[in-house]
Structure formats: structure tokens, C-alpha cells
Amino acid sequence: MTSEKYRFFLKKIEELYNKLHGVEARAKVVEVKDDGTVVVEFTGTFCHTCGVRDWLEDFAYLAVARGVEARLVEMIEPEGEEIDYKRIGVFKFNFESSQIESGDLGGDE
């Protein structure tokens, strides 16, 4: 996949995540690095539930279900007032090993 396809794929995963998680959790891809590291900002009331890490891991699971290796490598809890409704997820994506085609990027769960 080209860099443009990576970003398109991540945008589709972001949109699907937000559709599935509604108002409780919202994801926004904020950084994509050449080595496959992807930084995603998560906001919402999910931060007050148990299993906070699971909410972040769902982002990776949506990618895996579409043929791209992905895993959460770090969850960052911001300090200060933002901590109540925000978490940062650092993911590792392996786009190079995927066999995904452009037509496979969309789709609802």
C-alpha cells in the first residue's frame, strides 16, 4: 500500500470506530509515521468506565478484521484537566504485510 492508501485506510477505520462507538468514544488519527506508528486521540465518557484499554484496542481490531496487522503498544493518560475525557493510543500497523486492496477498505461491522 502507498502512503496515500495508508491514510485512506486509517480514515475509514476512524469513521467506522466512531460509528460503532457513538457518543461514548470518538477516535481521531493525529499522527502517522513512516515506520507504521499511528497515534490516535480518543475522547468521550468511556474514560470513566472499566476496561478503558479495551476501547482503544477496538481501533486495532477493526484494522485486523480488514487484513492489516495492528496492535496497541501504548496508552497515554494525559495529565491535568484533560485526563477525564481523553486518552492517546499509540499503535503499530504493519501495512507492508497486508494484502488489502482498495475495494476492501470500507465496510461496516
Locate predicted features:
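Domain-level signature for proteins that mediate thiol-based redox and metal-cofactor handling
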Residues: 1-109
